[in-house]
């Protein structure tokens, strides 16, 4: 199965040509503009934010998805 160097699987994506379950949604995502927000203030005490890091580690970003063979993202599949 040819992937054309692109693979999408949920929030894990490598390009945009393969595995598009919702092509119209992908179009809207690519045309969305982003804005930067600067927050000035005091950071919370260390004990209050420790759970946030652990929650982020359990997501797909922590698994280091990368394009693999047969139109798959490693470790998740299209």
From Swiss-Prot:
Phosphoprotein found in the keyword field: no
GO terms of molecular function: metal ion binding
Single Gene Ontology BP annotation: reactive oxygen species metabolic process
Pfam families in the record: Metallothio_2 (PF01439)
Keywords tagged on the record: Metal-binding, Metal-thiolate cluster, Stress response
Tissue: Highly expressed in roots. Expressed in leaves, rachis, inflorescences and seeds.
Protein family: Belongs to the metallothionein superfamily. Type 15 family.
Function: Metallothioneins have a high content of cysteine residues that bind various heavy metals. Acts as a reactive oxygen species (ROS) scavenger. Possesses superoxide anion and hydroxyl radical scavenging activities in vitro. Involved in ROS homeostasis during anther and pollen development.
Other comments on record: Plants silencing MT4C show decreased pollen fertility and increased level of superoxide anion.
Full protein name: Metallothionein-like protein 4C
Organism: Oryza sativa subsp. japonica
């Amino acid at each position: 199965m040819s992937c054309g160097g692109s693979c999408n699987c949920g929030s894990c994506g490598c390009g945009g040509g393969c595995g598009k379950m919702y092509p119209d949604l992908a179009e809207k995502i690519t045309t969305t503009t982003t804005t930067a927000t600067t927050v000035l203030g005091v950071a919370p005490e260390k004990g209050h934010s420790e759970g946030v890091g652990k929650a982020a580690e359990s997501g797909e970003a922590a698994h280091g998805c990368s394009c693999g063979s047969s139109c798959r993202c490693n470790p998740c599949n299209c």
